Curated annotation (Swiss-Prot):
Protein name, entry field: NADH-quinone oxidoreductase subunit N
MF-aspect GO terms: NADH dehydrogenase (ubiquinone) activity; NADH:ubiquinone reductase (non-electrogenic) activity; quinone binding
Keyword Cell membrane: yes
Keywords: Cell inner membrane, Cell membrane, Membrane, NAD, Quinone, Translocase, Transmembrane, Transmembrane helix, Transport, Ubiquinone
Main location as per UniProt: membrane
Length: 482
């Protein structure tokens, strides 16, 4: 019996990204003198694929949720919204990275091609409805980033960070795959919808292999998210990688990892909510505690922001573990806004790193207000937002998660989260103090950057303020996704 051909239209944007990645790779080989062409081709690709994704979802004849490739790929509101934010995040990451990479002679074509391929893994992961596509998307996301971390071949720390990232990433993938194999063995299916039905129909005491599989899946996901106690790679990789790569891996992949949690736990195993709820509580508390307390003692701003990301992913998990639509939407809002804030923070680190100078220490930001008041103001907005100061978006995101916790009577966890947030505010305010109340060392060069970079960092900083004052549209979007 001949098999029915899959409908390729829902996956056309992903195919377009793959095609353009190959075109840009060839362009980089044959047009070596005009080294900016790969950059502009990449940015045009991101604009076109965002428009194509929105057009296919909005104006095609599909229902609100459509499956293709034998139920392995799904196009729904959740996937479309997250894809658009991934495209936006990568677009800004490439703007910030261009001058930094050119100054350090980091291979530009390879950087953009690997970035696009990693982004292809992210969007494939977001649209996964099968354990096979979840794993393939995750590996396509991860493998290019291992190479990107080690791209700065003249820097030993970069190569070392790439090796660490690869080895620990391989362990995480192995754990995740082992967990998936147990789930497949217990349910006889790779389809997440079918797995959910099989898990609901099976009394847990008759099939303990499901719980073992769940433990390995949660551990693998925690590794990929960089949450405690599986966080050991995060500070070393963030510090050792070129700042342009740190910027990339600290933003869009977090959105894709959030989507992986939703697909695996919410779509695939809702009947095991009690079990994964308890695991996520432990992971979230450890992440908030270790992340915030370890960040306090850091003098390297990239390590500080790395520990900060561990804490923020802990806050995001608080929304997921609520097990309610409101909690999932709050976690989605938190992930998107954290990605925006992280873009701005690492964007400033990249912007300050000029002429072979690496702005990696907190003291390198000393006197920034006297050197460039506008950039200091943008950095202050971003840092205060990360700290959760009203009326910035970081405050709104934290309030959303706390509200979701209180609604499910987890008041003790909400109080704990507030206490950790107070601890976390210290290390952000310390950077602001250095920028505004300490004088700049005389040897520091003037801050010069392109108009494109200034516009990007200004939009980034003002977006943090604007969404904080008018969060309703993004909250509505997050609720619509569920």
């Amino acid at each position: 019996m001949p098999s029915e051909l899959p409908n390729f239209i829902p996956a056309v944007p992903e195919m377009f990204v793959l095609f353009m990645a190959l075109v840009i790779l060839l362009a980089g080989v044959f047009i070596k003198k005009r080294h900016q062409i790969p950059y502009y081709l990449t940015q045009i690709t991101l604009i076109l694929v965002a428009g194509l994704t929105w057009y296919i979802f909005t104006y095609s004849d599909f229902a609100e949720t459509s499956f293709t490739f034998h139920h392995m790929f799904v196009l729904d509101r959740f996937s479309v919204y997250l894809k658009l934010f991934i495209y936006l995040s990568v677009f800004f990451a490439f703007i910030y990275a261009r001058e930094y990479n050119d100054e350090r002679k980091i291979p530009h074509t390879e950087f953009y091609v690997l970035g696009l391929l990693s982004m292809l893994g992210m969007v494939a992961l977001v649209s996964s409805s099968n354990l096979l596509t979840v794993f393939l998307g995750l590996e396509l996301l991860s493998l290019p980033t291992y190479a990107m971390v080690a791209l700065y071949r003249n820097k030993t720390r970069s190569v070392e960070a790439g090796m660490k990232y690869f080895v620990i990433g391989a362990i995480a993938s192995g754990m995740l795959l082992y967990g998936m194999s147990m789930i497949f063995g217990a349910t006889q299916s790779l389809d997440l919808t079918e797995i959910a039905k099989a898990v609901s129909a099976t009394p847990l005491h008759q099939n303990l292999i499901l719980v073992f599989g769940l433990v390995f899946i949660v551990a693998g996901v925690a590794f990929k998210l960089g949450t405690a106690p599986f966080h050991m790679w995060v500070p070393d990789v963030y510090e050792g990688a070129p700042s342009s790569v740190t910027l990339f891996i600290s933003t869009a992949p977090k959105i894709a990892a959030y989507a992986m949690i939703i697909r695996l736990l919410i779509l695939g195993m809702p009947a095991l909510h009690v079990q994964w709820h308890q695991m996520l509580i432990v992971v979230a508390i450890l992440s908030m505690g270790i992340g915030n307390f370890a960040a306090i003692v850091q003098s390297n701003i990239k390590r500080m922001l790395a520990y900060s990301s561990i804490a923020h992913m802990g806050y995001m998990l608080l929304g997921v573990l609520c097990g309610t639509r409101n909690g999932y939407a709050a976690a989605m809002f938190y992930t998107i806004t954290y990605s925006l804030m992280s873009l701005g923070a690492f964007g400033m680190v990249v912007l300050m790193s000029r002429g072979g100078f690496e702005a990696e220490n907190i003291n390198d930001f000393a006197g920034l207000n006297s050197r460039n008041p506008w950039l200091a103001f943008m950095m202050m907005l971003i840092l205060f937002s990360l700290a959760g100061v009203p009326p910035l978006v970081g405050f709104i995101a934290k309030v959303g998660v706390l509200d979701a916790l209180i609604q499910v009577h987890l008041v003790w966890l909400a109080v704990l989260a507030v206490l950790f947030a107070i601890v976390g505010a210290y290390y952000y305010i310390r950077v602001v103090k250095v920028m505004y109340f300490e004088s700049a060392p005389p040897q520091l060069k003037p801050i010069r950057c392109s108009l494109e970079m200034k516009i990007a960092i200004s939009l980034n900083g003002l977006a943090v303020l604007f969404i904080g004052i008018f969060p309703g549209w993004l909250y509505a979007l997050s609720h619509l996704a569920f």
